[in-house]
Amino acid sequence: MALASAAPGSIFCKQLLFSLLVLTLLCDACQKVYLRVPSHLQAETLVGKVNLEECLKSASLIRSSDPAFRILEDGSIYTTHDLILSSERKSFSIFLSDGQRREQQEIKVVLSARENKSPKKRHTKDTALKRSKRRWAPIPASLMENSLGPFPQHVQQIQSDAAQNYTIFYSISGPGVDKEPFNLFYIEKDTGDIFCTRSIDREKYEQFALYGYATTADGYAPEYPLPLIIKIEDDNDNAPYFEHRVTIFTVPENCRSGTSVGKVTATDLDEPDTLHTRLKYKILQQIPDHPKHFSIHPDTGVITTTTPFLDREKCDTYQLIMEVRDMGGQPFGLFNTGTITISLEDENDNPPSFTETSYVTEVEENRIDVEILRMKVQDQDLPNTPHSKAVYKILQGNENGNFIISTDPNTNEGVLCVVKPLNYEVNRQVILQVGVINEAQFSKAASSQTPTMCTTTVTVKIIDSDEGPECHPPVKVIQSQDGFPAGQELLGYKALDPEISSGEGLRYQKLGDEDNWFEINQHTGDLRTLKVLDRESKFVKNNQYNISVVAVDAVGRSCTGTLVVHLDDYNDHAPQIDKEVTICQNNEDFAVLKPVDPDGPENGPPFQFFLDNSASKNWNIEEKDGKTAILRQRQNLDYNYYSVPIQIKDRHGLVATHMLTVRVCDCSTPSECRMKDKSTRDVRPNVILGRWAILAMVLGSVLLLCILFTCFCVTAKRTVKKCFPEDIAQQNLIVSNTEGPGEEVTEANIRLPMQTSNICDTSMSVGTVGGQGIKTQQSFEMVKGGYTLDSNKGGGHQTLESVKGVGQGDTGRYAYTDWQSFTQPRLGEKVYLCGQDEEHKHCEDYVCSYNYEGKGSLAGSVGCCSDRQEEEGLEFLDHLEPKFRTLAKTCIKK
């Protein structure tokens, strides 16, 4: 297929140059590429081709460092204008950028000129284009963007070699034909001419990739589909523009000349790396315009300062009207404008200063925590920042610390206050020198003659006032001796009335005396001891005992001072040790003694240790370092408690004897000992009793036996001969008038206590039983029956004893009255027992009505007692003599 074009001469020249002058080298990734080219290159000449994908596959931006060369996406290198190479090599770089991955690669291209001589013999490696068969593929065609026509506009023609043998019909497909944008291109099927129907915007379509087809009438395709690339040539139809209409930058004031302020960026939609997108920047106007403080680099758009005199206090904001123009800034290039705002950052370049050169104020003496003066300052730096916030200092005149100055955060004023009382009698005025600086460091301190601190003078006048007594010094120390006796006087606290410069008329009182050691003389302030001073008291800290004293004048004004009594140590305490130690036989056979002396070190160790003679048989004591001793067994002792008398003497000979309890135990550590507690065991003494002690024990035992024997003899029971009461009844029938209602009984339930009388003796026996009231007992001897009847009313106990040696008697001697005295308590007891319930508990207190015989009550019924089943233990009445059976029948329920 032959290529037909509108300009066959120019196409032929390009093919010749391409075949003779161009050398294309496919190189390794991102390495140098060497190309040999003719010394004279025309515009739009293909120089060579590099492999871009091997260096960076996803390159979104391809540009050349030399504007004389243009790089296509496939790696082809074209010249943008006529170029003449000297004999030396010429090099440039191809930059590949990936915006998403933020990667950038560089390919170095080196061009070397060669002579225009045709080689005698062409080798395959020297051939720029190898052609084994005539191909029907044309070179890429191009169309001008925004072309004005006329339309349809011829693009190019394709022809197939098969047209010599067949009737060929041509067709195309792809974007612009049967894809968006539709119907932009079409082809004449008979001739193969391709036409464009309308103008094209390159910013939408940079190129079109079409496919051409050659087929016969019957559909046979003698050729493969032909790729057709139609490139849209860029037209400078887009003016550059700033991404932001207004851009804001900041820069510190007083910065050096050449300081970078910021970089402006403009965008041009035309084809990159061409004159259409070669932009130039410049400043059209500065507001305010005098003096000129800024400049811009025309190619990079970086704005820098031109002077070091940017002063925020004069102007804090500048505006720059910027212009960006393409075509390398040529007047015919397209341009646009934007606004840049530059704000100056504040620096501490202005020190604060007082509004007045000096100040005068006054304050009453003895006043504290009062504000006496406020001082204002002025600062031109930015308000409410560390560059303008003031810090005040008192430089001179405050040696005693009477004043303090601070900053009011709301007004930035200096507030002068009195924190310690001033004395008019000592000084009537105070002159202070006050300085002020900023919180931030002054920025011009090293390069400027401006002072960083402003100072002023403050005169403080002190006003006299009638003040109270002064306790000076606040703490007074006096010396005393440990063990100082009671009733002695010590020098006390003295206060002063500053108005009269003496302590006359002042009265003193105690405010604090923890252990009440002293009393104070209210007129002189001297102390008098109430107790012996003891340095070892818990109220003494570091050998000092504190007393608070208040001095009061005539009108009630007062001051308070502290009197410290320093006690010098006196050797009044002997060394002390623990009362009990433990020796573990499984670990060691000794115990370590560590005495403690409450006195000071000068009255303490070294100590001396002595054993009593009675303990030397089993024990031995060894001194170690004057502070401790070792108590050791002479031989293994039994597991028990032992008492060991030990004497300990301090360095001045004060000695104390201690009875040390030593616990000898079968253990490894004292905490493992399981011997019973000391309070429940016997301590084995090591002291032998003397003869006088033994004699005293014997005499005491004899005396105790004598006392017990005497008490036994005195309290022995006497034997009283028993006798029988006379009885005049002599078994005669007694008229009891049973047919009548009987005698009136005023108390049915006769309760204890009851009185008894002994028939044989006129003496009465009354005993007391604990918790049961009075116990009464009656005894009757019945000669004939041979029994004695005892009635024990307090505890309810009844006994019947045989009377030994009594076998005779006259039964008629018993009188009726005596038997009545016997039966009346017994009947009362029976009635009392009938008043109990089935569990033998006492019944509730209630009145029981008893009817007369024959008036509704059953025979033999006496009320609540008729239902009882037990015989109350009266079986002994069955063995009485006949004369007692009548009484027994009366007592026993049938």
Curated annotation (Swiss-Prot):
Calcium may be bound by the cadherin-like repeats. Three calcium ions are usually bound at the interface of each cadherin domain and rigidify the connections, imparting a strong curvature to the full-length ectodomain. Glycans are attached at residues 165, 546. The chain crosses the membrane at residues 692-714. It is a single-pass type I membrane protein. This is Desmocollin-1. It comes from Homo sapiens. GO terms for biological process: cell-cell adhesion; desmosome maintenance; establishment of skin barrier; hair follicle morphogenesis; homophilic cell adhesion via plasma membrane adhesion molecules; negative regulation of epithelial cell proliferation. The modification Phosphothreonine is found at residue 385. It is found in: Cell membrane; Cell junction, Desmosome. GO terms for molecular function: calcium ion binding. The lineage of its organism: Eukaryota, Metazoa, Chordata, Craniata, Vertebrata. Binds to JUP/plakoglobin. The gene is DSC1.
